[in-house]
């Protein structure tokens, strides 16, 4: 790959970026126009800019899409956001060419969730079009497995591992609700003698991917409509089952908002229609300060649990107490 033009036009940039994708062994689907535009934006490249001027600033998906339009790629409807995230940026992360949230862990729904091209890739990119590129490419490919291991180890170290059954653990995604969810699974379950975990929203089961934990056998045993549950956008953060008195405990891990109000409670109830067990709704908070701030959102016939005081429960439904 070489170029005598230090300030390439857009067509030339795309051609050279596509060649980079090929050189790095990325699949054909990552060599189309959309992934190429994603890569150019993440490298802060545009016409009349030399590859040596590339950088690897952090990008959120929405700002990235806005920049793509500005660069000239107009065919981006708002509903393509997930495709950009999963099929383009996500593929770069899977290949260890980019990193999610390099500065600190964040929950998936954080508006500050971001991605960054890895430093080793940036070093290679800066050599595109120069006589040093073949050597830089060879060095990168020779060290690729070491590079992959480094970033995989970093992600693994950030995960929050918690045992939810005998000899069975799950990894909770770091950041945001992660610490609170881990505390619910460890402390709440301990103090209130909860013996089964039916569902956890924020778990990790691949090198990168976020995939909910779900006990399908328990769902079927309780008579929950599994297809309706899986396909619903209204699933809670955690669902527990207390088998000694047949209580299904639906928990929201509340950070900046999202406490169970009247509307939210009704939507959650619809997921468990015709289930022959008692239901209990719990808002989980990290601190009493957070509970106080959001108290007005919380509807009756729910409860509040605070991570700071794990053996206590606050009831928002008069004389009806949890699990009795």
Curated annotation (Swiss-Prot):
The lineage of its organism: Bacteria, Bacillati, Cyanobacteriota, Cyanophyceae, Oscillatoriophycideae. It catalyses: Endonucleolytic cleavage of DNA to give specific double-stranded fragments with terminal 5'-phosphates. It is an enzyme of class 3 (hydrolase). Pfam families: BsuBI_PstI_RE, BsuBI_PstI_RE_N. Activated by K(+) and Na(+) ions, whereas NH(4)(+) ions appear to inhibit endonuclease activity. Disulfide bonds: none annotated. This is Type II restriction enzyme AplI. The gene is aplIR. Gene3D superfamilies: 3.40.1350.80, BsuBI/PstI restriction endonuclease-like (1.10.10.1820). Its cofactor is Mg(2+). InterPro entries: BsuBI/PstI_C_sf, BsuBI/PstI_N, BsuBI/PstI_N_sf, Restrct_endonuc_II_BsuBI_C. GO terms for biological process: DNA restriction-modification system. Keywords: DNA-binding, Endonuclease, Hydrolase, Magnesium, Nuclease, Restriction system. GO terms for molecular function: DNA binding; magnesium ion binding; type II site-specific deoxyribonuclease activity. Its EC number is 3.1.21.4. Belongs to the BsuBI/PstI type II restriction endonuclease family. Optimum pH is about 9.5.
């Amino acid at each position: 790959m070489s170029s005598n033009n230090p300030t390439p036009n857009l067509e030339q940039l795309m051609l050279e970026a596509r060649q980079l994708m090929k050189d790095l062994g990325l699949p054909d689907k990552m060599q189309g126009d959309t992934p190429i535009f994603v890569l150019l934006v993440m490298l802060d490249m545009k016409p009349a800019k030399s590859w040596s001027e590339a950088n690897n600033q952090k990008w959120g998906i929405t700002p990235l899409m806005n920049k793509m339009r500005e660069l000239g790629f107009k065919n981006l409807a708002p509903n393509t956001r997930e495709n950009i995230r999963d099929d383009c940026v996500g593929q770069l992360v899977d290949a260890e060419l980019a990193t999610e949230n390099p500065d600190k862990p964040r929950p998936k729904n954080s508006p500050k969730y971001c991605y960054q091209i890895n430093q080793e890739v940036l070093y290679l990119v800066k050599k595109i079009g120069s006589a040093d590129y073949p050597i830089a490419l060879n060095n990168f490919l020779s060290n690729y497995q070491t590079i992959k291991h480094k970033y995989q180890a970093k992600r693994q170290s950030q995960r929050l591992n918690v045992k939810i059954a005998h000899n069975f653990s799950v990894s909770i995604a770091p950041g945001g609700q992660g610490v609170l969810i881990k505390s619910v699974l460890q402390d709440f379950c301990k103090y209130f003698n909860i013996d089964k975990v039916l569902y956890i929203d924020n778990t990790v089961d691949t090198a990168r991917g976020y995939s909910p934990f779900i006990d399908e056998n328990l769902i079927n045993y309780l008579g929950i409509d599994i297809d309706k549950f899986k396909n619903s956008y209204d699933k809670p953060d955690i669902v527990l089952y207390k088998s000694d008195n047949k209580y299904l405990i639906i928990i929201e891990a509340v950070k900046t908002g999202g406490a169970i109000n009247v509307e939210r409670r009704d939507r959650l109830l619809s997921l468990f229609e015709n289930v022959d067990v008692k239901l209990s709704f719990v808002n989980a908070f990290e601190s009493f300060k957070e509970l106080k701030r959001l108290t007005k959102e919380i509807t009756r016939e729910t409860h509040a649990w605070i991570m700071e005081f794990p053996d206590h429960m606050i009831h928002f439904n008069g004389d009806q107490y949890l699990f009795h």
